[in-house]
């Protein structure tokens, strides 16, 4: 565990109420990076922002955004501050995202209606997974589909063949996370990961945290 991180946490903790620290610990103890999701070139800020809010509420520590064609912008009226409590990782293209996630041990799972796709309820949860979501009109790029280890679909029983992106993310992530919480899989953050996130949260809570942290080295 990083001693510098622990030192900064110790200093900032003096400026946070016990009630707030307890709330932070409660959230940290339920955070996970075993599952994450990736948005590829989502152009509607309202939809993209809604997915960030969903990810934070469900307990994800990280989400990922590919910005090859469309820049990701947050709508504060939709995120309601959720973006400050989650790590938002951005990439210039799909390859960078895929390479990073694979190096971190994630299976690449593409949401798709192609014949190889399995139903969501049949997707196994034995490995870390990064679930990729594309636009409602065109779906994921050929690059992502070609690199995917697995393909998954949400069953649909009506005439329309596409869920709203924010709804799709909510259905998939909620389903997988509920199954994880009922399993014996060690899916929660380890102590080092919690410390790094704790420091992020403390910095969100403490005003002028940079000035306070600078005093550590003075």
From Swiss-Prot:
Ordered alphabetically, the record's keywords are:
Methyltransferase, RNA-binding, S-adenosyl-L-methionine, Transferase, tRNA processing, tRNA-binding
Q: Can you name this protein? A: tRNA (guanosine(18)-2'-O)-methyltransferase
Residues making up the signal peptide according to the UniProt record? none
Query: So which domain of life are we looking at?
Result: Bacteria
Q: Which organism is it from?
A: Borreliella burgdorferi (strain ATCC 35210 / DSM 4680 / CIP 102532 / B31) (Borrelia burgdorferi)
Q: Which GO terms describe its biological process?
A: tRNA guanine ribose methylation
Which InterPro entries does the protein's record reference? Alpha/beta_knot_MTases (IPR029028), SpoU_MeTrfase (IPR001537), TrmH (IPR033671), tRNA_m1G_MTases_N (IPR029026)
> Which Enzyme Commission numbers does its entry carry?
2.1.1.34
Q: Where does S-adenosyl-L-methionine bind?
A: 111, 154
Under the heading HAMAP family, the entry gives: tRNA_methyltr_TrmH (MF_02060)
Q: What is catalyzed by this enzyme?
A: guanosine(18) in tRNA + S-adenosyl-L-methionine = 2'-O-methylguanosine(18) in tRNA + S-adenosyl-L-homocysteine + H(+)
